[in-house]
A protein has these predicted regions:
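Glycine-rich phosphate/pyrophosphate-handling loop used in enzymes and phosphotransfer proteins
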Residues: 1-210
Length: 210
């Protein structure tokens, strides 16, 4: 088996549990590539998981003053290795890389069995340009289904906006017609920037009368 990132050949290691449960425990990454990704430690904002903090960050404090309680969970720090991964996966279209974090994401999503998963959508134009929704690929590779609940209108890319423009933008998400909205929803996205993105999805659900 070869590492999905660097192509290095890896030796398959069979464990007792994999033989007993007919489960494939093989990693998609070699040890060198795996070590470049950094897990979020215990020192972080309790609301958004911004790292190197022991208390609520300034952004979350501002949201709290507006009556909004940020509730976000993340697994990895967005370091250079993660930036390179998403550059290849999202922008170069290497769809095979959706499997890289499948086992990690699977273990994390198992904690939310009582929730219905909803993926943050791309606009039709962005989906046509990219060819796939990168978050849907990650969730499917982890072995989970999700609700096709939201749609998004086209807008200027977030990467071309200043921080103030991002915070002021009203993200154009809306609920698809004819769908049933569950009581407990877990919104899933790839990269956390600001809470606006998720807040606008919550508002879309609220506007639907649920």
């Amino acid at each position: 088996m070869k590492c999905l990132l660097c192509g290095q050949t890896m030796k398959a290691v069979l464990t007792f549990s994999s033989l007993l449960l007919l489960k494939n425990d093989a990693s998609c990454l070699c040890l060198d590539c795996d070590s470049t990704f950094e897990r979020i430690g215990e020192e972080n904002c309790p609301n958004c998981m911004k790292t190197d903090l022991s208390m609520k960050c300034q952004d979350c404090q501002l949201w709290c003053k507006e009556g909004v309680e940020v509730s976000h969970r993340a697994i990895f720090i967005y370091n250079q290795a993660m930036k390179d991964f998403f550059s290849r996966y999202k922008f170069d279209g290497d769809f095979l890389l959706r499997k890289v974090f499948a086992s990690v994401l699977s273990e994390e999503l198992k904690k939310y069995k009582e929730y219905q998963f909803v993926v943050i959508p791309l606009s039709p134009e962005r989906l046509l340009e990219r060819g796939f929704n990168q978050v849907e690929g990650l969730v499917e590779a982890a072995g989970f289904a999700y609700l096709d609940l939201l749609e998004k209108r086209e807008e200027r890319a977030s990467s071309s906006k200043s921080r103030s423009e991002r915070l002021e933008t009203e993200f154009p998400f809306f609920i698809k017609s004819g769908v049933t909205i569950p009581k407990k929803i877990l919104l899933i996205d790839d990269i956390y920037t600001y809470w606006n993105n998720y807040k606008s999805c919550e508002e879309a659900v609220g506007r639907s009368g649920c």
